[in-house]
Swiss-Prot record:
Organism annotation: Actinobacillus suis
Molecular function in Gene Ontology: porin activity
Quaternary assembly: Disulfide bond interactions within and between MOMP molecules and other components form high molecular-weight oligomers.
GO biological process per UniProt: monoatomic ion transport
Function: Structural rigidity of the outer membrane of elementary bodies and porin forming, permitting diffusion of solutes through the intracellular reticulate body membrane.
Localization terms from the record: Cell outer membrane
Protein name: Major outer membrane protein
Length: 21
């Protein structure tokens, strides 16, 4: 699952939040 945080940063959701560059 891929979502975006409030700043539009791509965040990978896989048990924990990780920033995806």
């Amino acid at each position: 699952v891929t979502v975006y945080d409030a700043e539009g940063t791509k965040v990978q959701v896989d048990g924990s939040l990780r920033l995806v560059e």
